[in-house]
Amino acid sequence: MADTLRYPFAAVPGPGAVVSVAPGVLWVRMPLPMVLDHINLWLLEDGDGWTIVDTGLKSSRIQGHWEQVFAAHLGGKPVKRVIATHMHPDHIGQAGWLCGHWNCELWITRTDWLFARMLSLEALPEPPRDAVEFYRRVGFPVDALDFFRNSGYGNFAKGVTPIPIGHQDRKSTRLNSSHT
């Protein structure tokens, strides 16, 4: 057994660039401002257009990277849909902007869509008392509780563009006769 990881590609895509991993499948990599410093996203050729899988965090910098990708790699074809695999901000953060930019639908499970919509609308100066009490009961140390109390509540909204009001529920959809 090898003691190092082997990667199938010698290079990773830089900001605004892609790597073709299979016919009609482009790997896009967007930066994240944390220890895990990137997210892998995908462009799938979809007949007369493209499907985006996951979107990156809300930021004008990432929107600029997407604009570079659109200009250089879509071959003049539109984006037909955006699929968010789940509701974390790095996966759905640019969904509102992308769907508005391309006038296309967001595809996501109903539960993740509802949760993302709820979290994006709930920004408060401090967390609700029951949220603080929950973390106290599960054993958060006092300093962590103080940090939680004083950090504001609703940071999810800072990492996402407005979540589209409409969506296509992924559980019942198919792409190219295959389940999503």
Q: Model-derived features: where do they sit?
A:
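N-terminal presequences and immediately downstream first alpha-helices
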Residues: M1-A10
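Glycine-rich, flexible loop/turn motifs
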Residues: L5, G14-A17, G159-T161
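A generic secondary-structure micro-motif detector
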Residues: R6, G56, A84-T85
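Residues that act as N-cap/strand-start positions at coil-to-secondary-structure junctions
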Residues: V12-P13, L36-H38, I163, R170-S172
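Conserved beta-strand hairpin/beta-sheet module of binuclear metal-dependent hydrolase folds
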Residues: P15-K77, C104
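Active-site HxH/HxHxD metal-binding segment of metal-dependent hydrolases
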Residues: R61, E67-S172
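Single conserved hydrophobic/aromatic residue that forms the stacking wall/gate
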Residues: K171, L175-T180
